Amino acid sequence: MENRNTFSWVKEQMTRSISVSIMIYVITRTSISNAYPIFAQQGYENPREATGRIVCANCHLANKPVDIEVPQAVLPDTVFEAVLRIPYDMQLKQVLANGKKGGLNVGAVLILPEGFELAPPDRISPELKEKIGNLSFQSYRPNKKNILVIGPVPGKKYSEIVFPILSPDPAMKKDVHFLKYPIYVGGNRGRGQIYPDGSKSNNTVYNATSTGVVRKILRKEKGGYEISIVDASDGRQVIDLIPPGPELLVSEGESIKLDQPLTSNPNVGGFGQGDAEIVLQDPLRVQGLLFFFASVILAQVFLVLKKKQFEKVQLYEMNF
């Protein structure tokens, strides 16, 4: 009896451990496969290449627009908004990893000048917190606080992303100066077409790997197709695998050529990048400018008063 209870307890513990392991694997795998910024973080030390191209474009092949809006100038140690807009047709549906259709997600990378960083929560005003919503930003690297990533997040809710940014203070950071700085941004809507290892996702076109005749099209049980192509010249058979998602454009008995599209292009998203400029303004320069404007206004006032006084003197002399 005691041995039976011991066996039951061991069996229960093993089952629980296996279940927990499976849950952890699924959660981890899902988060990595869906989160495009993680791909960039894992594969590239810097998201912006020397050519100016942001590396996210290596996986998101379609070119789409983005828009970045920042203040023209900011003072040191000041929180300001950087607003990224990722426009797209909200009615569109994308092909998900399982081949079904679903809403588009969005993601972004913001490359700030050295010294600029994400504003700490205690410096963000309630109004700005409301604009940000439930978004959670993270640094590209622990030592690159000026590069921020976000996503994937639902596109219908966050096609406009507000970044809370804290400007640096040159008095505290000697490598920061009062200058005009560039800001770079990249934003995507929808899934990519290529994974970092070079393999295709199911959100792209699949082409024939051989010239020949489509001998057989087998629909797989879990979705997708297995296409047998026979080369008419030597009888060699090639099998092309199509994952769930793309729609077939060929049929059995059809003659095809090398690199001919076997499927439609299911991709409705894309990636875009842009840039803006911001001036880190010296407060003393602003004060000097205000003093100059005040001096000009006072000079104008005194000039008008002097003119009025001169006109009165002239009028007095004419009366005599």
Swiss-Prot record:
One of its GO terms (biological process) is photosynthesis. The keyword Plastid applies. GO terms for molecular function: electron transfer activity; heme binding; iron ion binding. PROSITE patterns: CYTF. Its main location: plastid. One of its GO terms (cellular component) is chloroplast thylakoid membrane. Keywords: Chloroplast, Electron transport, Heme, Iron, Membrane, Metal-binding, Photosynthesis, Plastid, Signal, Thylakoid, Transmembrane, Transmembrane helix, Transport. Residues 1-35 form the signal peptide. It comes from the Eukaryota. SUPFAM superfamilies: Cytochrome f subunit of the cytochrome b6f complex, transmembrane anchor, Cytochrome f, large domain, Rudiment single hybrid motif. Binds 1 heme group covalently. Pfam families: Apocytochr_F_C, Apocytochr_F_N. It is a single-pass membrane protein. It is found in: Plastid, Chloroplast thylakoid membrane. The chain crosses the membrane at residues 286-305. Heme binds at Y36, C56, C59, H60. Its cofactor is heme. Component of the cytochrome b6-f complex, which mediates electron transfer between photosystem II (PSII) and photosystem I (PSI), cyclic electron flow around PSI, and state transitions. Belongs to the cytochrome f family. The 4 large subunits of the cytochrome b6-f complex are cytochrome b6, subunit IV (17 kDa polypeptide, petD), cytochrome f and the Rieske protein, while the 4 small subunits are PetG, PetL, PetM and PetN. The complex functions as a dimer. PANTHER family: CYTOCHROME F, PTHR33288. This is Cytochrome f. It comes from Oryza sativa subsp. indica (Rice). The lineage of its organism: Eukaryota, Viridiplantae, Streptophyta, Embryophyta, Tracheophyta. The gene is petA.
